[in-house]
């Protein structure tokens, strides 16, 4: 096995690898199952970002969960802005440095959300949206992240504006990014992590 420094690790500290605490395996050294999971992710996503660098360590699970993330990239009933509202609310709740840093940029650049609103979402500060769908997505995600009851009035508005498909998209997206955040937190992945270029 290569040492962390031979693999381009963050430091000589044995507690850290190439991506936070995780020591990535170069593609050429992966066993068949791990390589299959890695390539499956690259095919679906076009790259192997963030926690996807870690998940091939459990190839069967990786094959199972990666399509969920890909669904939100291409087939969700939510707009990219709405997805980033949910993502910033739940990432902010968990406090994973890497995902908050990445999605602060993504929310602004790809979600077309105002910078002040994205930072408020991540920080758990109150904000609001002129678009009724974005507002109800924000309220629903905030209530769920705060482990509060979703009041009947909020649920009715969400059902009117998003439908049951949209509500399910919000809840499953929150679960997805909870998994993302907890993976990144367990491996202590810092906001400036890059990992191996492969």
Predicted features along the sequence, with ranges:
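Hydrophobic alpha-helical segments
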Residues: 1-198
């Amino acid at each position: 096995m290569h040492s962390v420094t031979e693999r381009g690790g963050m430091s000589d500290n044995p507690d850290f690898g190439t991506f936070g605490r995780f020591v990535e395996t170069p593609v050429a050294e992966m066993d068949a199952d791990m390589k299959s999971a890695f390539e499956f992710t690259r095919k679906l996503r076009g790259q192997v970002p963030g926690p996807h660098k870690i998940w091939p360590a459990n190839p069967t699970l990786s094959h199972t969960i990666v399509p969920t993330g890909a669904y939100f990239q291409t087939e969700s009933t939510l707009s990219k802005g709405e997805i980033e509202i949910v993502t910033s609310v739940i990432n902010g709740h968990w406090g994973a440095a890497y995902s908050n840093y990445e999605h602060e940029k993504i929310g602004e650049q790809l979600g077309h959300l105002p910078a002040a609103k994205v930072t408020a979402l991540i920080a758990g500060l109150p904000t609001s949206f002129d678009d009724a769908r974005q507002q109800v997505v924000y309220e629903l995600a905030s209530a769920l992240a705060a482990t509060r009851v979703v009041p009947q009035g909020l649920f009715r508005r969400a059902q009117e504006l998003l439908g049951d498909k949209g509500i399910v998209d919000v809840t499953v997206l929150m679960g997805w990014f909870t998994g993302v955040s907890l993976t990144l937190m367990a491996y202590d992945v810092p906001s400036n992590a890059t990992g191996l270029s492969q």
